């Protein structure tokens, strides 16, 4: 499983620089360890650091175990969503890469991509009993589905798409998958808009993935809890990939009295990285530093 997990870390130099001046010894909590790319870079340049790596995706944990094997007992991998975890000791840094990995997109069985047919799943945690995308579409009323597509995907044709999906359902019957869903969504667009640079189904697939995994809800939990995990002077670094996440991170960092924002504007990929790794084009890194340990969470 791990051998098929390919995940090139985005903004590697920016992450290293953001966490460069932290203490020589401490614990790094990688809230989305993925394939272990960011963590391996940080453990290399901080030989006194230990790692707690979280991921609810079993394929990601297997890949991380292989990537980080050379660090031995410095590494602890935990099967957990970061919203359900609390470290038992202060940490010097918290890192979260909120993007879907290349592996998750490239494996049709995961149901994240419309570029190859697969089941309408979209769950990050395939070992759990959470609701699939197909079940979610079937369960929601048309208006609720339209609201979901609009708010989570910023899809301007959300009403039209929701009406078509409910008309053509049920989707949780094992007969149709991601290709059929993408075809139905694209059919709601005028012919000239169906084959642009951004696929017509992109926003709807994003919205369904966010809803299935409660991505904004668990991010809210992380942003509320993580400052309490940090040592004074420790840093939290969050990489987001769409405006909903970035806006949430920006506003919470700014409003949280426990934190000092390190950079007013997000750090983004260089032209060279964006060309070499298209996934990095939409990546934004925001960093904040922990102030006094006595302050309570922002409400």
Curated annotation (Swiss-Prot):
Pfam families: Methyltransf_5. The keyword GTP-binding does not apply. S-adenosyl-L-methionine binds at residues 36-38, 55, 82, 97, 104. Keywords: Cytoplasm, Methyltransferase, rRNA processing, S-adenosyl-L-methionine, Transferase. InterPro entries: RsmH, SAM-dep_MeTrfase_MraW_recog, SAM-dependent_MTases_sf. GO terms for biological process: rRNA base methylation. It is found in: Cytoplasm. One of its GO terms (molecular function) is rRNA (cytosine-N4-)-methyltransferase activity. It is an enzyme of class 2 (transferase). Transmembrane segments: none annotated. Its EC number is 2.1.1.199. GO terms for cellular component: cytoplasm. It catalyses: cytidine(1402) in 16S rRNA + S-adenosyl-L-methionine = N(4)-methylcytidine(1402) in 16S rRNA + S-adenosyl-L-homocysteine + H(+). The keyword rRNA processing applies. Belongs to the methyltransferase superfamily. RsmH family. Specifically methylates the N4 position of cytidine in position 1402 (C1402) of 16S rRNA. This is Ribosomal RNA small subunit methyltransferase H. The lineage of its organism: Bacteria, Bacillati, Cyanobacteriota, Cyanophyceae, Synechococcales. The gene is rsmH.
């Amino acid at each position: 499983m791990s051998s098929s997990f390919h995940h090139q870390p985005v903004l590697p130099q920016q992450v290293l620089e953001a966490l460069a001046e932290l203490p020589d010894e401490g614990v790094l909590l990688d809230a989305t360890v993925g394939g272990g790319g960011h963590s391996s870079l940080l453990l290399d340049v901080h030989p006194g650091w230990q790692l707690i790596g979280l991921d609810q995706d079993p394929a990601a944990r297997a890949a991380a175990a292989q990537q980080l094997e050379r660090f031995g007992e410095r590494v602890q991998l935990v099967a957990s969503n970061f919203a359900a975890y609390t470290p038992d000791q202060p940490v010097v840094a918290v890192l979260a890469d909120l993007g879907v990995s290349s592996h998750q997109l490239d494996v049709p069985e995961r149901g994240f991509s419309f570029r190859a047919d697969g089941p309408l799943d979209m769950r990050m945690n395939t070992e759990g009993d959470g609701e699939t995308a197909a079940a979610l579409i079937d369960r929601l009323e048309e208006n609720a589905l339209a609201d979901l597509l609009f708010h989570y995907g910023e899809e301007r044709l959300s009403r039209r798409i929701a009406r078509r999906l409910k008309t053509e359902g049920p989707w949780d019957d094992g007969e149709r998958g991601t290709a059929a869903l993408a075809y139905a969504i694209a059919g709601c667009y005028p012919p000239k808009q169906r084959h642009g640079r951004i696929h017509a189904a992109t926003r709807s697939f994003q919205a369904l993935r966010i809803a299935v995994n409660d991505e904004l809800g668990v991010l809210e939990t992380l942003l509320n809890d993580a400052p309490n995990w940090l040592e004074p002077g420790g840093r939290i670094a969050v990489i987001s990939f769409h405006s909903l996440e970035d806006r949430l991170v920006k506003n919470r960092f700014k409003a949280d009295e426990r934190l000092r924002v390190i950079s007013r504007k997000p750090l983004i990929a260089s032209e060279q990285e964006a060309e070499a790794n298209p996934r990095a084009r939409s990546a934004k890194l925001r960093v904040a530093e922990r102030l006094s340990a006595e302050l309570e969470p922002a409400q």
